[in-house]
Amino acid sequence: MTKEQAQINISELVERFNEQLVSYKKSEYNETLTRRDFIDPFFKALGWDMDNSNGYAEAYREVIHEDKVKIGGATKAPDYSFRLSGGKRLFFVEAKKPSVFVKDEILPSYQIRRYGWSAKLPISIITDFEEFAVYDCTKKPNTADKASTARVKYLTFKDYSKEFDFLWDTFSKEKVLKGSFDKFVASDTHKKGTTTVDKEFLQSLDHWRTLIAIDICKQNKNLDEDEINFAVQQTIDRLIFLRIAEDRSI
């Protein structure tokens, strides 16, 4: 897919969406239809093999639908995981139906940021085709955050034409393989106040160590200082082991 043809294809999607916008905004028009009618063709125009038409083995698929991410002991499923050959994740895309207000609703933004944060991805996307929001996932999400928190780019479908260079240069498969995605991540998402999930985990250990020590003292008044320290360290070691196991999907 050339850049010129991709722009034509996306322009046709925009025109069709605009012509029937009222119908698409109705609640009956669901997420599955949105994905099939608009989101899949949108990313296909950007060069991604959305349905594995190349017949690649599972480990080499470019796009995984309903990928698996462990969050707090539970397994969640982002709608799309875009990957390099060999399975390295680049970014998630979470699809919504057009009746969802992507710009202002808190839950969708928290959801995608939580997925990206847990998977250690730099950015991820929410889109219902009508709206397209890119989020920095290196900043730990909080349920009290606004929908605009950590959002580094926001477009509506009417912006796709004038912003096509951005879409192509950042998210097309061709440009991703040439490093443009990495340049965008480096320039726009590594901001002051961001941290990684590993750094956050390590920072939490000191706080947990104190809480664990206090609890052990309360529950075991007969233990001396060395015994308490041993019990605390043993508990911390188990937490670290569980974290490593989670990262390795064990």
Ranges and model annotations:
Residues V22, K26-D40:
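Nuclease catalytic cores
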Residues D37-K44, R114:
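Residue-level detector of alpha-helical secondary structure
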Residues L46-D51, A245-I250:
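Short helix-capping/linker segments at secondary-structure and domain boundaries
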Residues F42, N52-G86:
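Active-site metal-binding core of divalent-cation-utilizing nuclease and nuclease-like domains
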Residues T2, N30, S53-G55, F91:
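Generic signature of intrinsically disordered, low-complexity, basic-rich segments
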Residues F43-W48, A213, C217:
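A general structural signal for alpha-helical elements within enzymatic catalytic domains
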Residues S27, E31, V69-K70, F101:
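Short secondary-structure transition/capping motifs
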Residues M1-L21, I71-A74, P78, L84-L90, ...:
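Short, basic/polar, glycine-containing "phosphate-handling" surface segments that engage DNA
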